[in-house]
Amino acid sequence: MPRDLSRSRSPSPSPSRRRKHSRSPVRQRHSRRSRRDRSPSPYSSHSYSRRKSRSISPRRHRSRSVTPKRRSPTPKRYKRQKSRSSTPSPAKRSPAATLESAKNRNGEKLKREEEERKRRQREAELKLIEEETVKRVEEAIRKKVEESLQSEKIKMEILTLLEEGRKRLNEEVAAQLEEEKEASLIEAKEKEEREQQEKEERERIAEENLKRVEEAQRKEAMERQRKEEERYRELEELQRQKEEAMRRKKAEEEEERLKQMKLLGKNKSRPKLSFALSSK
């Protein structure tokens, strides 16, 4: 906004002052066109179409009439304008008419710039007014809230709400603690049951292992006893066979002795017989 105000206070250059610096209508026209190209205004398209429709050909002929022996500073632009224009060129204008039309265009441009400046200034003022209004409304609301908070009734209501909130919070905490206690008791009971089951399982496994060990020992003892009994029977059989052999041997020896005794007894009886015979 200060930039717009300074722009509005600064005096605008007069057409006569601009004409003093311009050397020819052709160069003045090109300089204005270059300024319009650098900073286009909201109305540039409309004004350019109007200027294009009515003043392309006259400017071309006018530039030839004013400076016939001087080459234009921008010949390419004239070539483009020449290629665009398809209508026959109207009658030539005088330099005074050209200056008058330039003055009118400058006046329109200044008028548009002034309107644009006023519009921006109004927008800036409206924005400032809106911001100031928002600040005042916020300040009024803040003061109203502070006044309401300072009243005794509001204080009591706030204290009541705080007390209710504290009570509700205590109840929620107590309920949560009770739930956690019950959950911990249930967990401890489940843990005890699991430990008891694990203990019983371990005892059962130990008892089964003991039974298997005892069974293995019993089987081993029975097998050992069976082997000992077999060995004992074998020893008895060997003893019996040995005794039987000894009895047979003894019987054979007795029989042999008897045979010898018989033989000896026969031998003793023969000489007596022979002697008896001889004594006769």
From Swiss-Prot:
Superkingdom assignment: Eukaryota
Pfam family, one: ARGLU
Region ranges (Disordered): 1-124, 177-280
Basic residues: bias regions: 16-36, 48-83
InterPro entries: ARGLU1 (IPR033371)
Annotated Basic and acidic residues bias: 102-124, 182-259
Name assigned to this protein: Uncharacterized protein At1g10890
